[in-house]
Amino acid sequence: MKCLLVIDMQEDYLGNSRDVKRYPYKSKELIHSINNKILEYPNESIIYIVNRFFWEIGRKPKKLVDGLSVISNNVFEKRMPSCFSNKKLLEHLQKIDASELELVGVDGNYCVGASAIDGINNQYKILFNASLVGVGDYNKFIRTKKKLEKMGVVFTS
């Protein structure tokens, strides 16, 4: 099964009250484009990932960004850059017989990039949809992209 992993599309990275210097993404465009991609997948194959650092455990749960189409209950939390650090996500992917994963979200240099690497290491075919991945530092992303391509990540747009 082919799945769409929507990574870190949450209020603190893309919402109106975010630190824009730290998270300079074109939020509205990215949300709109990802919503269009979500429409291409059956509900059960859409998986949302939220990032919650260990020091945030006592706080409110992370909220997906307003405006993002949330059409499945497949929401997994992670505490490390790679979404594959969540064992429940790995179990879910095995249960639904996932073999190909399209990654979208933020940031291409960090969590989406780390998830792409771990996805390859976990024997998944990884599609990195560059037009649907927010990147804060494009100069760094040139190096990140080369590394990912070398590992076998397939870039699409």
At which residue positions do the language-model features occur?
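A short glycine-rich beta-strand->turn/loop micro-motif centered on a GG-aromatic cluster
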Residues: 102-105, 124-138
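Active-site acidic carboxylates
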Residues: 1-75, 90-91, 95-96, 154
